[in-house]
Design a protein with these regions (language model features):
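Transmembrane alpha-helices of Major Facilitator/SLC transporters
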Residues: 54-63, 253-262
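Symmetry-related core transmembrane helices of the 12-TM Major Facilitator Superfamily/SLC fold
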Residues: 81-87, 168-187
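C-terminal ends and interior cores of transmembrane alpha-helices
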Residues: 80-100
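Glycine-rich segments within core transmembrane alpha-helices of 12-TM secondary carriers
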Residues: 55-58, 137-162
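Helix-loop boundary and gating motifs at the non-cytosolic
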Residues: 2-55, 217-241, 247, 252
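Cytoplasmic helix-loop-helix junction between adjacent transmembrane helices
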Residues: 110-146
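Juxtamembrane intracellular "pre-TM" segments in multi-pass secondary transporters
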Residues: 1-7, 190-221
Length: 262
């Protein structure tokens, strides 16, 4: 039986995961649709996937986060500061016009994805350290629920709201939502970890060892090909629906709500 403290801890991590996913899913969905409506080429829309690059290369600065965290408070500071930047950037995008400030919007979104990726680094590390081995499956389920739930809301429900209230009204609400999702972590005093002892830094030889392990390139190749096909297909589905004459509301229902369940 799960006690109240553990339930609160799991709910706290669910809030963190869904807070990072909803805005990212929304931007990744609505911008290709808006670009196609403005007659951008499919090549340009395909290149838009590069805005997700911070999440792909976040391993480059994850050692920095890990090196400067030893206590629960350290992890919380990384999470709070990252999410605050995330919310500020989302709010800033709301003040801009999509047509007139397109490249500024893209720049701010990329920076916001850096912030959300940094939050994810700290959140994952805290989750690993705060839960025992037998409870890690439960916090992993919170991560999955936050990811799929955030995808459904961000690429589905918010697209429906976007159709009703527009860009400039929706994004400030989204920024506030990100901050509200930090409240459980702020009030949660039950998440405790054993302070880490100073450890030896990874050397070039350690990195080289990882990439020279037996069969490692087969695994990397499989992941690369699997996700390349999946992401490439999804990137073109929504612009294709625009070409077929579907409205933003219909695309949100089909691609976001129904598509997530499938």
């Amino acid at each position: 039986m799960i006690n109240k403290e553990k339930t609160f801890n799991l709910a706290t991590f669910f809030c963190l995961y869904i807070a990072q996913t909803i805005p990212m899913s929304f931007f990744s969905t609505v911008i290709p649709v808006m670009m196609r409506q403005e007659n951008f080429t499919l090549s340009a829309i395909g290149l838009l996937q590069l805005i997700k690059l911070p999440w792909i290369v976040k391993f480059l600065w994850s050692p920095i986060v890990d090196r400067h965290t030893a206590t629960t408070g350290d992890y919380k500071r990384w999470i709070f500061s990252s999410e605050l930047i995330y919310a500020i950037l989302i709010f800033s995008v709301a003040m801009l016009d999509f047509k007139a400030d397109f490249y500024t919007i893209l720049t701010l979104i990329i920076i916001s994805f850096v912030a959300s990726a940094t939050q994810d680094i700290a959140t994952d590390a805290l989750a690993v350290l705060a839960f025992s081995r037998k409870d890690k499956s439960m916090v992993n389920s919170m991560q999955s629920m936050g990811s799929f739930g955030g995808s459904m809301v961000g690429s589905g429900v918010l697209l429906l709201l976007f159709h009703q209230i527009g860009w400039n009204s929706l994004l400030p609400c989204l920024a506030v939502f990100v901050l509200v999702m930090l409240l459980p972590l702020f009030f949660n005093k039950g998440i405790q970890i054993t302070p880490k002892l100073p450890q030896q830094r990874a050397k070039k030889a350690d990195v080289l060892y990882f990439f020279t392990q037996r069969s490692i390139w087969k695994q990397i190749g499989f992941l690369f090909l699997y996700y390349s096909g999946l992401i490439g297909t999804l990137a073109m589905v929504r612009p294709w629906l625009v070409d077929l004459g579907y409205s933003v509301q219909e695309i949100g229902m089909m691609s976001g709500v129904a598509g997530t369940f499938v």
